[in-house]
């Protein structure tokens, strides 16, 4: 579920590969299918992390023009609900097309450092998708934005929480394990144990060997956060 994710946590639990050729020929569903009721989205976003992280976080919600602040926080953390727009930019290639899936809801809370360096990337991905750009066009735009400094440099690892009990990461997946997202620039899977695709974690889930690499680390299922 970008990343989404992100949302590619689904890859780690055996989600069948999409037919990329078929998906890429489709237009995006209407934006209305991606939107949620505002209050419900705020509650879902806060469920991404424990209260100590999310209670004083800034909450953003998706609109037809991108994410906007719904509630201003004061601790530097930012929580929102990622959609399929947060798919990997490069790899695994077969999951780039989950941008077309409006059912994905992936609550995430970016800690303050991640909000500064990783969140702008996900917001740009979302805006490009809302503008109708294809996965290839999104990748080209992000690569150019990073190279020219329009996106913040990723020079250190940062983290985000995805602990919600109410995740929906893809058809047949729904709520996966609560987990941490490590934004680990240029990491390869061999650097986190080399665990085979679909086996035990941690693993690189998105965009290995690039500035946008994501490593997924699960936590105890008992830590899953429910909406209040």
Go through each PLM region and give its residues.
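Bacterial N-terminal signal peptides that target proteins for export
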Residues: 1-8
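N-terminal signal peptide c-region/cleavage motif recognized by signal peptidases
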Residues: 14-19
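Primary mode marks residue(s) on the alpha4-beta5-alpha5 output face of response regulator receiver
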Residues: 24-228
């Amino acid at each position: 579920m970008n990343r989404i994710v992100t949302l590619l946590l689904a890859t780690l639990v055996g989600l069948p590969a999409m037919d990329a050729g078929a998906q890429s020929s489709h237009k995006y569903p209407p934006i209305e299918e991606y939107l949620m009721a505002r209050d419900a989205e705020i509650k879902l976003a806060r469920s991404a992390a424990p209260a100590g992280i999310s209670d004083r976080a800034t909450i953003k919600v998706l609109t037809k023009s991108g994410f906007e602040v719904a509630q201003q926080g004061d601790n530097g953390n930012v929580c929102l609900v990622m959609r399929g727009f947060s798919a990997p930019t490069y790899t695994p290639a077969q999951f780039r097309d989950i941008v077309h899936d409006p059912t994905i809801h992936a609550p995430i809370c970016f800690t303050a450092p991640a909000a500064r360096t990783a969140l702008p990337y996900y917001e740009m991905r979302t805006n490009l998708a809302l503008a109708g750009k294809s996965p290839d066009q999104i990748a080209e735009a992000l690569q150019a934005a990073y190279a020219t400094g329009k996106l913040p440099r990723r020079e250190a690892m940062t983290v985000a929480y995805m602990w919600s009990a109410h995740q929906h990461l893809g058809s047949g997946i729904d709520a996966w394990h609560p987990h941490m997202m490590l934004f680990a620039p240029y990491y390869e899977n061999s650097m986190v144990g080399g665990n085979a695709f679909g086996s035990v974690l941690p693993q690189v889930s998105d965009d290995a060997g690039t500035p946008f690499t994501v490593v997924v680390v699960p936590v105890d299922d008992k830590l899953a956060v429910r909406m209040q």
